[in-house]
Amino acid sequence: MNSIYILVFSLLWVVVAYFWYGKRVIKRKLIDPVDENPTPSHAMQDGVDFYPAPSIVLFGHHFSSIAGAGPIVGPIVAVTCFGWGPAAIWLLVAGVFIGAVHDYLSLMISVRHQGVSIPDTAEKYVSKKAKFLFLVFVWLTIVLVIAVFGNLAATSMITKPELVIPTFALIPLAMLFGVINKNRWLPLWVNTIIAIAGLIFLIWLGFQFPITIGTKETAYSIWFTLLMVYGFAASVTPVWILLQPRDYISSWVLILGISLAFIGIFIVHPDMNAPFVIAETFKDTSQGPHVPFLFIVIACGAVSGFHSIIASGTTSKQLDREKDAMFVGFGGMLMETVIGIVCVIIAGAAITWGTGENELQWIFKNSGGALGVYGNGFGRLTSFIFGNEVGVVIGITIVNVFIMTTLDTSVRLARFLTNEMIGDKLPAKLQNKFFYTVVAIIPAFLLGITDSWASVWPLFGAANQLVAALVFIILTAYFYSKNKPIRYTLWATVFMLTMTIFALCWMIWKYFVAAPNYFLGSVAVILVVLAVLMIIEGCKKIGSAKKA
């Protein structure tokens, strides 16, 4: 099959889904937004966390934060393990009916509860115990994300020293954009063009003056430490001066990159040469059996629990009007779905399937894994513009820009979660954003600087999808309490819980029997227990509501 057909169908699919399922079904039947309702960004405006943003700027922040490397890595891994057919189908179906619903509803529930996180709302709609369990679990997950993305960013600056200048010089550029935008010294579109031009110049400057420091170990320690310092700054400074503008500017990098990929697909129009389904690995692969691990491997682009924490963390506090949430939340997720489809095409068509040198499996194993596949495939699609080598570098640079946007947002999210989890239990002198950030940064720093994060990372995919499943429990309980139809969230709750628990049980078998690793096996058991406890709490709430 020619890749153009897949891309065109996917684009039509998400456009129809946005206007039909998003606007006509989910928005009208479950939320019914009213612009006259003051959003937290206005009602609780403090100039630091709560501050209204233009919808396009907020879309850029939200989209950059949820994207990261996820919609690139997951689909490419899935193509190599399961085939391009299952990967594309899961992206298109889940992206619309699970992921976009999950993100939009998480955003709106937070907006209607003073901008608190989804785990915090669990106390009201499920139970106090559910809130505590969920907050602790999500906090630990976010700390792990900070460590891992800090590691990825630091490592990328060692392997690609050309990235050092654009990574750090974007900070003052973003701050300048933020000040100009806040004071309205220039129209937004003019400010945007200047900022994008500035970023392109910084990327060019980075390639002219790559920066290296001492040994690999020394460089890693320095870059990782500086990234944690930056994360601290992005967490405590007003959102409009650094976090929001940096993410917004970065979003244009990915949009321009994906646009180039579109052009490449339409001009080169390669045929899909990877298998539609890899039948011989249907029962067992390095990633686990197709069912349920397809639904774990591809998270971003389909459904990701991490998105709900961003939507109810930073995004809900910046939403200007309730009606903007559809564009930001639902639309942002569908944009990620399109990126996932492009990556399926890159892996399944732009690169020849096979184990020979420079073929897909060889590149995946010997040249940077999924990110190496993306860079090489992007280079081949855009070789008629830049040449293959320059195209590869541009592709990898795009990915690295987005690693930073997930890192800085995660630190701020960890601060919010720390406040919600223990803020009211601390002495008054410690109830401040600086202390909350330190509480989150220190364990993340220790995990990253010692590489200890690697010991638990194999379980992150399942843990992330468990977050999504638990969020759907809360959403279902919320709509049940409001006498709204629960069919749009209940089926997703059951599906995500089933697939996630199935995956965790397989991991328990693997780490206790097939390939013993008792630490990982024990963590998997804890996650299953957490899921069961949340199910029990949710059922109790619905049962008590029926009796009442």
Regions found by a protein language model. Name each.
Residues M1-V16, I196-W240, Q244, I249-S250, ...:
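A generic transmembrane alpha-helix motif of multi-pass inner-membrane proteins
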Residues N2, G22, I72, G85, ...:
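Transmembrane helix-loop junctions in multi-pass membrane proteins
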Residues N2-F19, A78-S110, P119, V164-A174, ...:
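Extracellular loop-to-transmembrane helix junctions
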Residues W13-I72, S251, G288-P289, F293:
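Membrane-interface "cap" regions at the ends of multi-pass membrane proteins
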Residues K23-Y51, V77, A88, L92, ...:
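Flexible loop linkers connecting adjacent transmembrane helices
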Residues F50-H113, K124-K128, V145-T159, D324-G354, ...:
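Membrane-interface helix-loop-helix modules in multi-pass membrane proteins
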Residues K128-V143, G331-V338, E389-V392, N400, ...:
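Loop-to-transmembrane helix boundary motifs in multi-pass membrane proteins
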Residues I265-T281, L334-N376:
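Extracellular/periplasmic helix-exit of transmembrane alpha-helices
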